[in-house]
């Protein structure tokens, strides 16, 4: 029988107190390949010491789907948080429009990384009277693409 003040019990409790926070605070990383709920594919390169990153985006949805090409993205994230907030801009190569995304990188209870985002897309219009219809708003959830080894 183990007495309540046993050194073994104290050692066990101390070990659990030190290890448990690390188990629940898995860091979410933006770097890698992601796909969203619509089938778009995004690749984010390494995040530098300032939190800056670049990458590419291939949308699965467009007004002219036959013209879709890989488009560059440029962004920044907060580096200190385990589940960082971020923002990036996509310069669409196949249309006169630009999109900005803001979001947060989460690790869910099962350990899966998820990017929850909101976006604005600005379309080019020929006249200021059409400004009212030039900005679209939406949201996308991205999940990390599995690699062959997984």
Swiss-Prot record:
| A single Gene Ontology CC term | extracellular region
Q: Name one GO molecular function term.
A: biotin binding
Q: What Pfam families is this protein classified in?
A: Avidin
Q: Where does biotin bind?
A: 36, 40, 57, 59, 63, 95, 99, 140
Query: Where is it located?
Result: Secreted
Which residue ranges does the record assign to the Avidin-like domain? 26-147
SUPFAM superfamilies per the UniProt record, alphabetical: Avidin/streptavidin (SSF50876)
User: Keyword Hydrolase: yes or no?
Assistant: no
The PTM entry states:
Glycosylated.
Main location (coarse class): secreted
Indicate which residues are glycosylated according to the record.
Answer: 54, 67, 93
Q: Which InterPro entries match?
A: Avidin, Avidin-like_CS, Avidin-like_sf, Avidin/str, Avidin/Streptavidin-rel
Q: Which cysteines are joined by disulfide bonds?
A: 28-105
Name the keywords, alphabetized.
Answer: Biotin, Disulfide bond, Glycoprotein, Secreted, Signal
Question: What family does this belong to?
Answer: Belongs to the avidin/streptavidin family.
Subunit structure, as described in the record: Homotetramer.
PANTHER family attached to this UniProt entry: AVID PROTEIN-RELATED (PTHR34399:SF3), AVIDIN-RELATED (PTHR34399)
Outline what the protein does.
Forms a strong non-covalent specific complex with biotin.
What protein am I looking at? Avidin-related protein 1
């Amino acid at each position: 029988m183990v007495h309540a003040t046993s050194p073994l019990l104290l050692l066990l409790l101390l070990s659990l107190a030190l290890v448990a926070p690390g188990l629940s605070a898995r860091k979410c990383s933006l770097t890698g390949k992601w796909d969203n709920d619509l089938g778009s594919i995004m690749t984010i390169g390494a995040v530098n010491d300032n939190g800056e990153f670049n990458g590419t985006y291939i949308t699965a949805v467009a007004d002219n789907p036959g013209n879709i090409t890989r488009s560059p993205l440029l962004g920044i994230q907060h580096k200190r948080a385990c589940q960082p907030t971020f923002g990036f801009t996509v310069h669409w190569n196949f249309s006169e429009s630009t999109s900005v995304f803001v979001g947060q990188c989460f690790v869910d209870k099962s350990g899966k990384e998820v990017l929850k985002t909101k976006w604005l897309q600005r379309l080019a219009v020929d006249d200021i009277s059409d400004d009212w219809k030039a900005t679209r708003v939406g949201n996308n959830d991205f999940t990390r693409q599995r690699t062959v080894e997984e």
